[in-house]
Amino acid sequence: CTLRKHKPNRKPRTPFTTQQLLSLEKKFREKQYLTIAERAEFSSSLHLTETQVKIWFQNRRAKAKRLQEAEIEKLRLSA
């Protein structure tokens, strides 16, 4: 967004391919936290950097937590 102020040397958003996203989601369902070795191997297989995979997993865990909290709130309100 042009209204937001970012560092001029900020890396642009990574456009993940559909196949990468499917692989990332599958791996996340298996395991929400990767070891350094797992992350290195997995990122290499997807042709992504370890940092990209690390950040994707951080964001996905935050999303999972947000969805879980919304579900709990929905159940609480319907009780």
Curated annotation (Swiss-Prot):
Keyword Protein transport: no
Keywords tagged on the record: Developmental protein, DNA-binding, Homeobox, Nucleus
DNA-binding stretch(es), residue numbering of this chain: 9-68
GO MF annotations in UniProt: DNA-binding transcription factor activity, RNA polymerase II-specific; RNA polymerase II transcription regulatory region sequence-specific DNA binding
A GO-annotated cellular component: nucleus
Single GO BP term: embryonic morphogenesis
A matching Pfam family: Homeodomain
Cell compartments where the protein resides: Nucleus
Cysteines joined through disulfide linkages: none
Entry's family note: Belongs to the Msh homeobox family.
Protein name: Homeobox protein H17
Organism: Apis mellifera
